[in-house]
Amino acid sequence: MIARVVPKLPYINKEHTVNFYVDKLRFTLQSDYGDYLIMSLDSAELHFFSYPGLKPEKSDFMIYLRVEENIEGLYQQYQKDGVAIHPNGKLEDKPWNQREFAIIDPNGTLLTFGQPC
């Protein structure tokens, strides 16, 4: 039986990736296996693998992070912490009944945060 899905995301520079997710997004670094990282925030878990040839400006990697409550507070906290919101990713209600905002990590991965309206 499948318990949950855990995304595996690429990184170019481990230090920049850890600093971004831990210092800016408030994730916890759970494990560091050299070229493989595991981080978590609340019930979300992300795995990261080294991908030296990745071009952030051409990355097609993206994930959707479901927010259970207070997406406005999370959005405001990230802005206060200096997290750059994607120019097309300001907090807004979408036609698919989700309130969303988006950011791009240092590796070019699009992170969309969403909560049902």
Please state what every model-predicted region is:
Residues 1-18, 63:
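N-terminal beta-strand motif that seeds the catalytic metal site of vicinal oxygen chelate
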Residues 7-10, 95, 102, 113-117:
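Short beta->alpha transition motifs characteristic of CBS
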Residues 1-3, 55-60, 95:
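Short glycine-enriched loop/turn motifs at secondary-structure junctions
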Residues 63-110:
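Vicinal oxygen chelate
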Residues 28-61, 66, 110-115:
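Conserved short beta-strand elements that form part of the metal-binding/catalytic scaffold
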Residues 14-25, 110:
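Conserved active-site alpha-helix within GNAT-family acetyltransferase domains
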Residues 24-29, 83-85:
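Conserved acetyl-CoA-binding loop of GNAT-fold acetyltransferases
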